[in-house]
Amino acid sequence: MWNKLQCPRTELELLFTLCGGQCFRWRKSGNNEWTGVFGKRVWILSQDESNILYKVVTSSQQQTKGRKRKLEKEPLAKTTNKHGDDDLSVEREMLREYFRLDVPLEQHYAQWSSQDPHFKSAAVKFKGVRILAQDPVENVFSFICSSNNNIARISSMVEKLCSLYGQQIAEVDGTMYYDFPPVEALTGTSVENKLREAGFGYRAKYIHQSACRIMEMGGADWLDKLKTLSYVEAKTQLIKLSGVGAKVADCICLMSLGHLESIPVDTHIYQVAAQNYLPHLRGRKTVTDKMYTEIGEHFRTLYGPLAGWAHTILFCADLKMFQEDTPAKKKKKA
C-alpha cells in the first residue's frame, strides 16, 4: 500500500530531481518508480499528477517480521517512535525536508522565466526540478567520486562504498540496501588499498585522506557547522579537503549545506553560459578560475539567492539522458 504526500508534479518531478546528478543512491525500479536510501531507510517513490507516493522499509521492520517484506502486497505497520510521533508522520516530514517542499517552486520558475528568455524555454519541458537537502557526509564523498566520471559510474562507486563500509538496512526485491558509512569508517589504514582494489583509482586516496581530515576537524559535526558559515567561508573550508576543488565544493555547498546561491560550473554549464549568456567565452578549451568565477557571478546576479537552484534546472535541460525522457515528450507521444 502506497502512502501519499500531496505535491503537484509541477512542484516536484522525481525523474529530473533523483536522476539529474545530485544524488547517486537512486535507481529506477519500475515504471514511474524509484528506489533509494536516505535517513537510514529504504524508500520506494512514485508519483501521480497530484501526489508523491511512497513506501518505506527500515532495518527494524525487517527484524521484527523476520522475513522479507512483500511491499506490493503488505501495508506498512503504523508504529510510534521514542518521541511519541507515529512513523508515518515522521517519514512524511523527512520527505518534505529532503525535497525542500517548503520552497514554492512554481513561483520561482515564474520569476526566473520573466527575467531570462533562455530559462523560460528550458523550463517548459523541465518543470519540478528540486534541490535535494542531502546528508553532508554522503554528499562530500559522493562528489569526491565524481572527479572525471559519469553519473552511472559514480552511482556504482557510491554503492560499492556503502556495501563495503555501510550498515545493512534492508533487502528489497532481492537487493540489499546499505546506509552510507560514517566518516570514521573510512579512516582505517586499509581503506585506500581496499578501494583501489574495488576500482576507485586515485579517488581512493582522496576518500581516505578527506575522511581523516574531517575527523581531525570534528567529524560530521564539523560538516554540519559549515551550514552556519557564509557560502564563501564554507567553500573555502571544503577546498582544504583532498579531491575537493571549486566545482566539487560548490556541489556540496548547494546540495547539502543549504548555500543555494552556489553555482557548480562543469562543461555543461560552461557551454550553456557561453552559448546563451557570455558569448565572449565561446571556444575556450578549459574553464579557468577567472571564467569559473565570472560564470558563477553572472548567474547569481541574474537569479538571486536561489541561483544554484535555477542553474540546476538549466543543467538538467542540457543532459543528453533527459532529451528523450521528459514527461512532456512522453505525453506528446501518447
Regions found by a protein language model. Name each.
Residues 1-334:
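HhH-family (HhH-GPD) DNA N-glycosylase catalytic core used in base-excision repair
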